[in-house]
């Protein structure tokens, strides 16, 4: 399973670790992804999404029905 938020599209990004001596080594910054079940009232079932914590806040704001409609319009299976 890829580390991509289904709502926001957040992906891992790359950067550097910096030691006290300013040595740099490459590292990855991973998004804070959660597997979360949401209840779809109109379909009377749960849908499981892999979303970032910001994605969960967006779902709280807009509503799960709106987000699922947007995901299906993009062609994602929900």
UniProtKB/Swiss-Prot annotation:
Protein's GO biological process: translation
GO molecular function, one term: structural constituent of ribosome
Keywords for the protein's UniProt record, in alphabetical order: Ribonucleoprotein, Ribosomal protein
GO cellular component terms, A-Z: cytosolic large ribosomal subunit
SUPFAM superfamilies, A to Z: L28p-like
Sequence segments annotated as region (Disordered): 1-23
Keyword Ribosomal protein (UniProt): yes
Domain of life: Bacteria
Cited Pfam families: Ribosomal_L28 (PF00830)
PANTHER family xrefs: 39S RIBOSOMAL PROTEIN L28, MITOCHONDRIAL, LARGE RIBOSOMAL SUBUNIT PROTEIN BL28M
NCBIfam families registered for this protein in UniProt: L28
Family: Belongs to the bacterial ribosomal protein bL28 family.
The protein, known as: Large ribosomal subunit protein bL28
Gene: rpmB
């Amino acid at each position: 399973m890829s580390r991509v938020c289904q709502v926001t599209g957040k992906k891992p990004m790359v950067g550097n670790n910096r030691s006290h001596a300013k040595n740099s080594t490459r590292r990855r910054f991973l998004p804070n992804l959660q597997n979360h079940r949401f209840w779809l009232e109109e379909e009377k079932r749960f849908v499981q999404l892999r979303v970032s914590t910001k994605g969960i806040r967006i779902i709280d704001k807009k509503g799960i029905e709106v987000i699922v409609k947007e995901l299906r319009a993009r062609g994602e299976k929900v």
